[in-house]
């Protein structure tokens, strides 16, 4: 398998990722700002297919209409010259002081109205550029103090805003869907819709739930101690994986935004196997962008920025290669069969069977030999996982 990225791999990068200057809460930038044209040209040379951005990444908050249009035109020119596309756009409702208490859920009604206007304008830009996904990360939607935010009221305002956006894209005829990006905390002490499960539940309350899915990020779910692959499987199962953010995270701590695979490598392996092949038991795989939302380390110069961008794509392709070998190994197939992984797809009830039938079936309870599972009938899960790790480590081909 070739390890050189191509457009067919659908690798994309956020402008805020390759453009990260190294500033953090404890120190200023260590690199200069990145011009958008240079960013587009360099990721094109590396083999990526897409660039994503927040509005404030492309033109500064408070820019005049002329300044805004100048940057949009420069981006369009670079896209035309390189063939790079914009698959996703999002809006920054977290950096400017006006959003100190959030955008859609700020306690200040005027701020909420301003936030909606800012988003509507950027949806128009997304449609103009051909983006089909609009991500919503509510980084400031939350609180540090329980008494400071009425969560029930905040969720209702969140719902009101998302419903309005759904009306807008429908009435405009835009081919755009929304993807909510969960995160448990940071920058707020607690963020609304903190995990993938919270977001999926919230989506079901909306007036147009078919227009709204999720954009889970590796590090965000792992900050909450969750298994990212398992969460992605549920999002796929519910038809809600509209976009995905790939990066690396090493445990429950601050959002590290490492290169993909440079954190929990085993979970990254199972994730790529799922995205490419549908999981060990089959099921739906993912055909959308493989989007890298990482930060080049503060220690790096501009050469290190592009090395880290390339590393994301190479890590994904290496893991894809390892997943293909894992699937093709006859011993793995034997271990999967011994572990009865596929049997989960056999309905527990027979066709047409009701609770009356299962209550009448003595073999399911009265005559079932439960003691036979003591000292016997192991599932072989450890052997299966050992085979997976040996493939991950390149010990098996």
Swiss-Prot record:
The active site is at 54, 57. It is an enzyme of class 5 (isomerase). Its cofactor is Mg(2+). Transmembrane segments: none annotated. Binds 2 magnesium ions per subunit. One of its GO terms (molecular function) is magnesium ion binding. GO terms for cellular component: cytoplasm. PANTHER family: PTHR48408, XYLOSE ISOMERASE (PTHR48408:SF1). Homotetramer. This is Xylose isomerase. It comes from Clavibacter michiganensis subsp. michiganensis (strain NCPPB 382).
């Amino acid at each position: 398998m070739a390890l050189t990225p191509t457009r067919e791999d659908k690798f994309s990068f956020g402008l805020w990722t390759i453009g990260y200057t190294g500033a953090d809460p404890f120190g200023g930038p260590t690199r200069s700002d990145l011009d958008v044209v240079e960013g587009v040209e360099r990721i094109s040379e590396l083999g990526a297919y897409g660039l994503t951005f927040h509005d404030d990444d492309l033109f500064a908050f408070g820019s005049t209409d002329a300044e805004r249009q100048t940057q949009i035109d420069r981006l369009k020119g670079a896209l035309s010259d390189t063939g790079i596309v914009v698959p996703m756009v999002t809006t920054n409702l977290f950096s400017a002081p006006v959003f100190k208490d959030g955008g859609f859920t700020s306690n200040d009604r005027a701020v909420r109205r301003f936030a909606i206007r800012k988003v509507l304008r950027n949806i128009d830009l997304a449609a103009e550029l051909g983006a089909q996904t609009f991500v919503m990360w509510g980084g400031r939607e939350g609180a540090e103090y329980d008494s400071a935010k009425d969560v029930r009221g905040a969720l209702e305002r969140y719902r009101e805003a998302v419903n309005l956006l759904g009306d807008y894209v429908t009435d405009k005829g835009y081919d755009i869907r929304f993807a909510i990006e969960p995160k448990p905390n940071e920058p707020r002490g607690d963020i609304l819709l903190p995990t993938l499960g919270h977001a999926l539940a919230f989506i079901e309350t909306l007036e147009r739930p078919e227009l709204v899915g999720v954009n889970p990020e590796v590090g965000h779910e792992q900050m909450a101690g969750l298994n990212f692959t398992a969460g992605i499987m549920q999002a796929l199962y519910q038809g809600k994986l509209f976009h995905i953010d790939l990066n690396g995270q090493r445990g429950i701590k601050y959002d590290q935004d490492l290169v993909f695979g440079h954190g929990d490598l085993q979970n990254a392996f199972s994730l790529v196997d799922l995205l490419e092949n549908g999981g060990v038991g089959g099921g739906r795989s993912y055909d959308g962008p493989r989007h890298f939302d990482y930060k080049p380390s503060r220690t790096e110069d501009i050469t290190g920025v592009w090395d880290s961008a390339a590393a994301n794509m190479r890590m994904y392709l290496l893991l894809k290669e390892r997943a293909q070998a894992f699937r093709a190994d006859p011993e793995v197939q034997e271990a999967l069969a011994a572990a009865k992984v596929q049997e989960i797809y056999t309905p527990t009830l027979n066709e047409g069977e009701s609770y009356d039938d299962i209550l009448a079936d003595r073999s399911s309870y009265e005559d079932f030999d439960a003691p036979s599972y003591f000292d016997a009938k192991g599932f072989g899960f450890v052997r299966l996982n050992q085979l997976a790790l040996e493939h991950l480590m390149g010990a098996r081909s």
